[in-house]
């Protein structure tokens, strides 16, 4: 049994000066460090560019579109730890230079969502205990549940997002400002600021249906490899086969971030990660049967791939 990869989901944090809410909003659309002004001015100005990018990002459902937007940002953008200005980049500028901070990501992400006809979205501004630096991200509401989109996969429900900072980053979020951002007759309207007290927010893991995830993963793996599924490979070398091999893949902190809302996307993600391993790919070409089992060990997801021939 061999461990072949470790996947850690961590949101990159902002640098000092990432967010400025104190600049007054003017009637024109100047360069600005005020994120609400940037949302309302930059997005309409760059909307055709945003629409062109959004049309290239696949997504037959809202879940797939959101997932693929974050994946696109991972592939094309990176965090700028040395940005010397708090002026927010226009989406077209951010796409061109490929580096930005949390406010740049938030404006671009909101723009891509709105250009994908996902509206409203929500601007989230997080305030931390004992840290004056603020952090901006975007959220969407799916079936009454708020998911935070923050630069990288996966989308996280609010519980998961809070525990990420407290457990993995050592930072406590005290409260958040929440603004509605929506398209109205070609304009981007930012409205409805409200405050969410998160200081005593309890952590409740996202919905986890291991059976559903395992079944989707089995189907996806069979589709990609054309291997024959054999459930008895879990325990024995089945009759008619001469060799059995087991691979183990660990996804760290999976329980903290997983939610069944994105079960289809997670099953595809796990299959992708397994098949990125060249040794596993080589084995698959030499074996004829497979099975996959998954289980949680603490917060980690353990995936076992059984191969037979």
Swiss-Prot record:
Tell where it localizes.
Answer: Cell membrane
Q: Where are the transmembrane segments?
A: 5-25, 106-126
The species is Pyrococcus horikoshii (strain ATCC 700860 / DSM 12428 / JCM 9974 / NBRC 100139 / OT-3)
The protein's name is: UPF0252 protein PH0672
Q: Which Pfam families match?
A: DUF553 (PF04473)
Domain of life where this protein originates: Archaea
* InterPro entries hit by this protein: Papain-like_cys_pep_sf, Transglutaminase-like_domain
Q: What's the family?
A: Belongs to the UPF0252 family.
UniProt GO cellular component terms = plasma membrane
What keywords were assigned to this record? Cell membrane, Membrane, Transmembrane, Transmembrane helix
* Signal peptide stretch: none
Q: How does it sit in the membrane?
A: Multi-pass membrane protein
| UniProt keyword RNA-binding, yes or no | no
């Amino acid at each position: 049994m061999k461990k072949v990869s470790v996947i850690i989901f961590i949101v990159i944090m902002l640098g000092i000066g990432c967010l400025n809410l104190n600049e007054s909003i003017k009637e024109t659309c100047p360069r600005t460090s005020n994120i609400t002004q940037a949302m309302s001015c930059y997005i309409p100005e760059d909307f055709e560019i945003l629409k062109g990018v959004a049309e290239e990002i696949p997504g037959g459902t809202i879940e797939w579109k959101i997932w693929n937007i974050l994946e696109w940002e991972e592939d094309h953008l990176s965090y700028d730890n040395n940005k010397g200005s708090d002026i927010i980049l226009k989406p077209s500028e951010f796409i061109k230079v490929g580096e930005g901070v949390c406010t740049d990501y938030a404006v671009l992400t909101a723009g891509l969502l709105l250009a994908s006809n996902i509206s409203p979205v929500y601007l989230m501004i997080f305030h931390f205990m004992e840290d004056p630096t603020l952090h901006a991200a975007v959220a969407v509401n799916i079936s009454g549940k708020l998911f935070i989109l923050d630069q990288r996969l996966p989308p996280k429900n609010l519980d998961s997002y809070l525990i990420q900072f407290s457990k993995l980053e050592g930072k406590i979020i005290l409260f958040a400002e929440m603004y509605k951002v929506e398209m109205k007759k070609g304009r981007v309207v930012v409205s409805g600021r409200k405050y969410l007290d998160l200081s005593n927010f309890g952590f409740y893991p996202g919905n986890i249906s291991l059976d559903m995830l395992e079944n989707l993963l089995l189907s996806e793996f069979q589709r990609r490899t054309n291997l024959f599924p054999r459930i008895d490979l879990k325990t024995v070398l089945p009759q008619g086969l001469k060799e059995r091999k087991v691979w183990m893949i660990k996804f760290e902190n999976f329980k903290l971030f997983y939610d069944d809302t994105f079960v289809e996307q997670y099953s595809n993600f796990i299959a992708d990660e397994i098949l990125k391993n060249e040794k596993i790919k080589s084995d698959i070409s030499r074996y004829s049967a497979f099975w996959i089992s998954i289980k949680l060990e603490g917060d980690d997801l353990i995936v076992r791939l059984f191969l037979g021939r």
